[in-house]
Amino acid sequence: MSLPDSPLQLIGILFLLSILPLIIVMGTSFLKLAVVFSILRNALGIQQVPPNIALYGLALVLSLFIMGPTLLAVKERWHPVQVAGAPFWTSEWDSKALAPYRQFLQKNSEEKEANYFRNLIKRTWPEDIKRKIKPDSLLILIPAFTVSQLTQAFRIGLLIYLPFLAIDLLISNILLAMGMMMVSPMTISLPFKLLIFLLAGGWDLTLAQLVQSFS
């Protein structure tokens, strides 16, 4: 069936393309990676290096690497039924093809967040609608996954930030003891932070831990 002969499919494809950036940010590992990289850059004290486009590009590449098995599993299960006049997002296609993606969301979401959104649905949604929502619905899993990823990103960011904060405080105290109060501690501490980060294999450790943090 060609696209001009199936306007519903064309509308569906255009709609998915329009929300694709939102799906990538909120429904994949991209959010956690981007937040951690931004915190790491701020902790090092280099506000504009690497630029945002480089950080987001690295986060996107790593997201493709992390999501690769899930995407391949979805592709293998994607066997849409061609029904005349029916859109391609049928419930049968959804239940079969998106099972690996649901498993990814469940494994990387905190159970308390999922339960929070389930209880929120019970308290706020109309009775006739909430009865149709399954416990593993994407309407529950995606928000729970997003909040869980933000929480984990802030935890990792805190662990990254503390050592560099200690270096800043140490340099600041040394400068005060030497009477060099007019010298910016950030200017002196930046080379030391970069040196320690490189000697410790900071990029390898950070990327390895981030990738391994996903089930």
From Swiss-Prot:
Q: What are the record keywords, sorted?
A: Cell membrane, Membrane, Transmembrane, Transmembrane helix, Virulence
Name the source organism: Salmonella typhimurium (strain LT2 / SGSC1412 / ATCC 700720)
Q: Which GO terms describe its cellular component?
A: plasma membrane
The UniProt record lists the keyword Transmembrane: yes
Q: What upregulates or represses it?
A: Repressed by methyl-3,4-dephostatin.
Where primarily located? membrane
Name of this protein: Virulence protein YscR
Q: Which PANTHER family match?
A: FLAGELLAR BIOSYNTHETIC PROTEIN FLIP, VIRULENCE PROTEIN YSCR
Q: Which residues form a coiled coil?
A: none
Can you tell me where the transmembrane regions are? 10-30, 53-73, 156-176, 188-208
Tell me the compartments it is located in.
Cell membrane
Biological process GO annotation list? bacterial-type flagellum assembly; bacterial-type flagellum-dependent swarming motility; protein secretion
Regarding the membrane, this protein is recorded as:
Multi-pass membrane protein
Query: Pfam families from the xrefs?
Result: FliP
> What protein family is recorded?
Belongs to the FliP/MopC/SpaP family.
